Curated annotation (Swiss-Prot):
GO molecular function: RNA binding; rRNA binding; structural constituent of ribosome
Organism: Yarrowia lipolytica (strain CLIB 122 / E 150) (Yeast)
Domain named S4 RNA-binding: residues: 42-105
Keyword Zinc-finger found: no
Protein name: Small ribosomal subunit protein eS4
Family stated for the protein in its record: Belongs to the eukaryotic ribosomal protein eS4 family.
Xref: Gene3D superfamilies: 2.30.30.30, 2.40.50.740, RNA-binding S4 domain
HAMAP family the record matches: Ribosomal_eS4 (MF_00485)
InterPro entries cross-referenced by the UniProt entry: KOW (IPR005824), Rib_uL2_dom2 (IPR014722), Ribosomal_eS4 (IPR000876), Ribosomal_eS4_C (IPR032277), Ribosomal_eS4_central_region (IPR013845), Ribosomal_eS4_central_sf (IPR038237), Ribosomal_eS4_KOW (IPR041982), Ribosomal_eS4_N (IPR013843)
Amino acid sequence: MARGPKKHLKRLAAPSHWMLDKLSGTYAPRSSAGPHKLRESLPLVIFLRNRLKYALNGREVNAILMQRLVKVDGKVRTDSTFPAGFMDVIQLEKTGENFRLVYDVKGRFAVHRITDEEAAYKLGKVKRVQVGKKGIPYLVTHDGRTIRYPDPLIKVNDTVKIDLATGKITSFVKFENGNIVMTTGGRNMGRVGTITHRERHEGGFDIVHIKDALDNQFVTRLTNVFVIGEGNKSLISLPKGKGIKLSIAEERDARRAKQE
């Protein structure tokens, strides 16, 4: 009979977007409890060791973290399995580098470097808007933040721009047709486009129709859609490829053109 939380994760059961090889051991680092779900997060040890190659093993990652050199969303994190997730800003003090965790078109977290100005804020998708004790209104974002006294115009599925230094909302973007979005789940994960149409299904999943910069149309569930800007203007910089998924033939042609 299981008592308490699970503490281990077999390597083969780890999320595929962590891109761990099968033969380097039996176990994988298991994300701690935190702002993102295990299967939607990237532990700091994998980011520093496997992605950036700043450490050779877990012991070296711990040595880096214990010097309090790594910040996630402006807060020092010393837990090597802290779950960083979508839209989180990771800052490395010694190298002066800033990264934002966003998906590439293959559904993996891209190593996306950003400027100091962009590292000062993050976007949060509004999951819930409610009235709490003593009639105080509040909203909850996708990364577990509770923000009190929000603008009454902010509704569920809208996106808020959060200043990381104060934790306050500086602006927000409505979930509306014509706004630019990124897909955060499903087979179209990581693709970027503008909303063209929303199908409402009572008792089922609402479907959102999206058109990318090359006029390719695709659809996904409403829960997978994250608004990242108003109109065509994104509030964040996008990783290489700008969220445009090419077909296999288009990828081949692009490779050939590069070789020539």
